[in-house]
Amino acid sequence: MEDKEELRKLLRSMMRKSTDPRTKMQDEYLTDEDKAIQRSERPPAKKRACKDCTCGLKEEQEVRTRSACGNCYKGDAFRCSGCPSLGLPPYEPGDVVSFSMDLSNEFQGEDA
């Protein structure tokens, strides 16, 4: 009876193992340290201010919105991913760029 159980264990272990000779050769060169899975540590998630922020986080984030690359004025092709001017057209250094959100005046002249 013990022989049958040993035979079953042996067959199960053989079924689990890969019979591909390439993987067998690759495993020979790996050490235990290589086989250990290393988890990459993620940076902590950034806190976002809520819509009706009362703790001051919204104001703090507005102050921090500055570009680290210094290429804001050149255009989107030269801007970094965290650039506050991302999506805006190129401008001269030192100029203040602002857009009117009221588009109704622009379209009224075309209809009249």
Swiss-Prot record:
Keywords: 4Fe-4S, Cytoplasm, Iron, Iron-sulfur, Metal-binding, Mitochondrion. Residues 69-83 are annotated as: Fe-S binding site B. GO terms for cellular component: mitochondrial intermembrane space. The gene is DRE2. Monomer. Interacts with TAH18. Interacts with MIA40. The C-terminal domain binds 1 Fe-S cluster but is otherwise mostly in an intrinsically disordered conformation. A motif (Cx2C motif 2) lies at residues 80-83. [4Fe-4S] cluster binds at C69, C72, C80, C83. InterPro entries: Anamorsin (IPR007785), CIAPIN1 (IPR046408). It is found in: Cytoplasm; Mitochondrion intermembrane space. A motif (Cx2C motif 1) lies at residues 69-72. GO terms for molecular function: 4 iron, 4 sulfur cluster binding; metal ion binding. Its cofactor is [4Fe-4S] cluster. Component of the cytosolic iron-sulfur (Fe-S) protein assembly (CIA) machinery required for the maturation of extramitochondrial Fe-S proteins. Part of an electron transfer chain functioning in an early step of cytosolic Fe-S biogenesis, facilitating the de novo assembly of a [4Fe-4S] cluster on the scaffold complex CFD1-NBP35. Electrons are transferred to DRE2 from NADPH via the FAD- and FMN-containing protein TAH18. Belongs to the anamorsin family. It comes from Encephalitozoon cuniculi (strain GB-M1). The keyword Iron-sulfur applies. Pfam families: CIAPIN1 (PF05093). Residues 8-112 are annotated as: Disordered. This is Fe-S cluster assembly protein DRE2. GO terms for biological process: iron-sulfur cluster assembly.
